[in-house]
Structures are given as structure tokens and as C-alpha cells.
Amino acid sequence: CKEISLDLGGREILKDISLQVASGEVLGVIGPNGAGKTSLFEVLCGRFPAKSGTVTFKGQDVSALPLYQRARIGIGRTYQTPVVPDELTVAEVFKAARQAYKPYLNRWHVLWAMRLVRFSADPDMPAVQLDTLDRRKLLLSCLIMRRPPLLLMDEPAAGLINSEVDDFDDLIRVLAKELNVAIIIVEHRIELLDTIADRVMVMDAGEKISEGDLGMVLKDPRVRAAYFEDVH
């Protein structure tokens, strides 16, 4: 995206944000609460229209496309809370995901995605009974089976214990390096980004204040003032 600005309720949420991420690259996004990280994702996925600026995907301007069309062309998104339908089983969630795209995906796509993310569960189990890690893997499988070139991941480690974070860490590396997926990840756990992020962008008050490798940005006085003083 280039020079993205966003106003909500008369308040400026994003101010001239520009970023790019290449296939196979992981870009981490950090910043204090209220920095605009999730709002940036809302613009990129098409939920919020930007006040100004452009969103480009695979060389084409997609700024005017709504959320569902951006999803169909390959912009995938995960959320902080892995919400699954209360009334559907694991198998029914996969069926709904398969039929959301034309041509319909088949059972082979489901099995391939499940193996990739190391997800296994009784297909007749109500999806709502899955633990947090398996809910995340179920929803990620539903995205991955259509091979999106870009994934927006909003705090994928939220609610996970340390061993589960390590598992998800490995999974993100597989998606980026073996499937060549471009990944933008909002995450508060610096130790996770230290192992998976190729670059890190830091936001504060709706603006990008620093970008580069993690070690470099953590030494930036603006980052220490805006991010770490807020955290501590």
C-alpha cells in the first residue's frame, strides 16, 4: 500500500502509511495499543475504505474492491480471536469454506491444508469445542487450502502457551518459505517476531515511525519512546 490514510468518526486513524511485502517474506508490525495496526489490516483487506492512498496487490490497484473480492483474489486474513460457528462441526466448517469459492475446492484440498498446518481432529466434533490452537489451525487450514499469495495475521499467538507459540512459529515459517506466501503479522510477542520476521515496521498514533530488521528498530529512540515506555 502507498500513503494510506484513514478517518473514522472524524478522527484520523492512519496517516500516510506505506509498506510492501514480497512473496516468501514475513513483515512484522508492532506498536502500542491504539497505534492503528488492526485498522491498517481493515484497510488492506477491504473492510474499511481508505480516505486516501492506494492498495496494490500483485501489481494491480485493488483499492476499490470490497472485502469479499479481495478475499477471492488471494488476500487472506486471520483475527485476534479465532471465532468458529457454534452450530457447525469441523467437517461442516471445511465444507462451508470449500463452497465459498468457485470452482469449489474438493476434499483433497482440505487434507493437504490439514497436513500442512498439522491439524487433526474428529470431523464430527463441534468446532466450538476445539482449544485455541486447534481453532486457529482449523481457520488457517480453511484459508491455506485456496493458496492465498498474501496472509494478514492479527496476533496469531494470542491465547497460546509457550510450547504452542513455538508450534505456530514453525508453521508461519513453512507458509512463508515453502509456499512462498507473503505474510504481514501484527504481534506483541517480540520473541516470536525475532525468530520469524524478515523486517519489522513500527507504528505509533497512526504513523509509521521506523522500519528495518528487529535489532535496528528496537534501538531507534522513537520506538523506545513510543512503544516500550507505553508497555512498561
Where are these regions (language model features)?
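Q-loop/switch helix immediately C-terminal to the Walker
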Residues: 81, 88-99
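Helix-to-loop junction immediately C-terminal to a conserved catalytic motif
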Residues: 45
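Conserved ABC transporter NBD signature motif
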Residues: 53-60, 73
